[in-house]
């Protein structure tokens, strides 16, 4: 069950979507934790059939955020996304010699939760590879500074030269000495 903070989170729920939960999870795992605009680009370019209903749900959640809560769409991220199995529709297909085969049509329930990071105080500014980093983890200014330097190294904005981290185009300016 997804618990949401009503001040900064908005969700959209799609029930009885006619596809396998396994196939929908393949797409949901690609968009979880990403910004709203990047999610739209990913969903429009992925070649899976599951992308279209998920794209409609993301649009619906963004419309809920802008209309009901007044959030700006550029500050939204997909904070939570989950896929649950729904009911299975069973039909009988007639076959030769009076027999029949069962046809199972699975459904799934998809929940998309968008979060406005401009109004949320818990999230740290910099985005890392594995998701958003909580601000509570860093207690003093030095730890935040070290994390910012690590982030700049990760994004290839800084390089290591002789155990010192410097800007790529300014060889004389040393920011931090690694000891």
Curated annotation (Swiss-Prot):
It is found in: Plastid, Chloroplast. It comes from the Eukaryota. SUPFAM superfamilies: Ribosomal protein L22. One of its GO terms (molecular function) is rRNA binding. Its main location: plastid. Pfam families: Ribosomal_L22. GO terms for cellular component: chloroplast; large ribosomal subunit. One of its GO terms (biological process) is translation. The keyword Magnesium does not apply. The keyword RNA-binding applies. Keywords: Chloroplast, Plastid, Ribonucleoprotein, Ribosomal protein, RNA-binding, rRNA-binding. NCBIfam families: rplV_bact. Belongs to the universal ribosomal protein uL22 family. Part of the 50S ribosomal subunit. This protein binds specifically to 23S rRNA. HAMAP family: Ribosomal_uL22_B. This is Large ribosomal subunit protein uL22c.
